[in-house]
């Protein structure tokens, strides 16, 4: 999957919890001219200069198609995206599934469009294992070791843990009630490499992670999986409250018209996606439910 979904640091959860604490994120929205360009925030995922260049090309296309002046801005970190939307320092943002739930809850944002990647608007998470270890079912992982990605990663922790909890394999949200040991690898690639090199018995990651991160067919052939989650809605673009409905409609029409093959190079540059489809807040209710089960909803 393109990298604005790959890893969502736990800091974004903590930052969202802190938004209502005096002194945290309490700066007023900056004054802006009526004709000032809208700002699209890009979630940090790779070299900032390269991402900024891709973002600039992307918003030029949006402006041309919609007539709405736009600019792109690479966020310093994931937590900063939610806070920038809340304080109206940015107007739209690429967001992860968990990031959207937080932006909706903390900033009142609404989802505008949903990404299409590999022809799909959803993905799954899996527990990957080496095929030569004789592990066939989730139950076979009892007493084994596992690599997760990050405590706030949808496919690298939250959804895999919910799968284990719903099957009665994990108790009290503690992976060590089922696994001998559990670690956070930090990235999806690192989690897969830990399996390949025998440092752990299993790794949690998204459905296309081996093809995206291992690349070598010989390595991919060594990896199988023993459990798969329900679908997770794709990432997308959200818009903050206060952007006029007429403007939002123009932007949505423009975004839905950006698709392959005409815009294939542009879409690959920005986040390696195929285009966008209609989205609805209800699409992300399963993410809210999973976060609730994992006790990751910040208090009101």
Q: What do the PLM-derived regions correspond to, one by one?
A:
Residues 2-7, 11-80, 88, 265-300:
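N-terminal hydrophobic or amphipathic helices and topogenic motifs
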Residues 35, 40-63, 98, 123-191:
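Bilobed "Venus flytrap"/periplasmic-binding protein-like clamshell domains
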Residues 36-45, 51, 116-129, 214-258, ...:
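Periplasmic-binding protein-like
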Residues 72-83, 172-193, 231-233:
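Short helix-initiation/N-cap motifs at beta->coil->alpha
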Residues 83-140, 151:
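Acidic, polar ligand-binding/catalytic clefts
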Residues 94-106, 160-166, 194-221:
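A ligand-binding cleft/hinge motif common to bilobed small-molecule-binding domains
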